[in-house]
Amino acid sequence: NFLDCCQSFEIKPIIVLFDDCHYPFPQLGPQPLPIRGIHNSGWKQSPGHQIVTEIFELKTEKHLKRLQTYTQELLELYKEDERILMWDLYNEPGQFGIGEKSYTLLDYVWNWAHEIRPSQPLTSCLDGSIGDSIIALNQNKSDIITFHTYEAEKLEPTIEKLRTIGRPLMCTEYMAREYGTTFEFCLPIFKKYNIACYNWGLVAGRSQTNFNWETILYLNEERDKGNLVREGDSLTEPNQWFHDIFRQDGSPYSTDETAFIKKILSNKELQ
């Protein structure tokens, strides 16, 4: 259903299997309600730092068969599906303090994926990951070199550094308005270098990624107050959006911004 929905809007998703970012201890079943005004309050790590650490410490291999089955069955099922743009096997391995411990699982995941070898490209980001061995592994294994850059002053130097690798480049995370990586700033640079870019946020929904990262500091306080987003509740919004483009009613955060996006994508000369 998800892929059909994406196809109906001419969107090709990048499918992410594992992730070291945000909150640990993921569990199956009903999930906690989002916390109002907090960036991405429900996002969970996959499979979670506890399991990643156990795999690193070789305390148990009970998780490996399950994770291998998850990885390979998914890739096998959709390996020829043209609705999928790419597989991002592991988002930002090493993030949120776990560091090089993620290397062990990451290496397993790359090997599992190459046993299936889907038709779509495989990747895991360089800039955005933590740890020299992790970054080196991703650079060696990725069909397309992907990177994450939110700070305006780092975007062009990052591209200059990574283009020497000699493989196609795609920026799969960018656009934090308060850090200067607006569409008006980033898209001309991507166009200059012929770099692909993928905007992960579209509509400001219950994940509330239009609020900035600093709001995470108030997560426990707001949760204790019971300040939750329930089904059918209207959503508040900050004066300056961090990420995302549209409201749920389809109106843009900035009409000037969406006009600029349309203009640069139409290949008309920028003013």
Label the model's feature ranges.
Residues 1-144, 148-149, 153-156, 164-165, ...:
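Active-site mouth of glycoside hydrolases
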Residues 193-271:
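Aromatic- and carboxylate-lined catalytic core of secreted/periplasmic carbohydrate-active enzymes
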